Amino acid sequence: MSLEDRAKATGKNIEGKAQEALGNVTGDPEDKAEGKAKQAESEVRHGVEDVKDNVKKKID
């Protein structure tokens, strides 16, 4: 996985955690939901890149 892709996914996770926390503090369910969605997107991105890494290792 490229370092850039991993950094983007990690950034998205941090952004999601911050947004979810803001939603918890303000009581805004939309912020909470969007924050959780960003975290889920980050997990999917990491998973896809991990699969790419594993395939590349097997090919090499």
Swiss-Prot record:
Q: Give residue spans, biased composition: Basic and acidic residues.
A: 1-18, 29-60
What is an example of a Pfam family matching this protein?
Answer: CsbD
Chain spans, region Disordered: 1-60
Entries under InterPro entries matching the protein: CsbD (IPR008462), YjbJ_sf (IPR036629)
Chain coiled-coil ranges = none
Protein family (similarity comment): Belongs to the UPF0337 (CsbD) family.
- Under which name does UniProt file this protein? UPF0337 protein asr1134
User: What organism does the UniProt record list as the source?
Assistant: Nostoc sp. (strain PCC 7120 / SAG 25.82 / UTEX 2576)
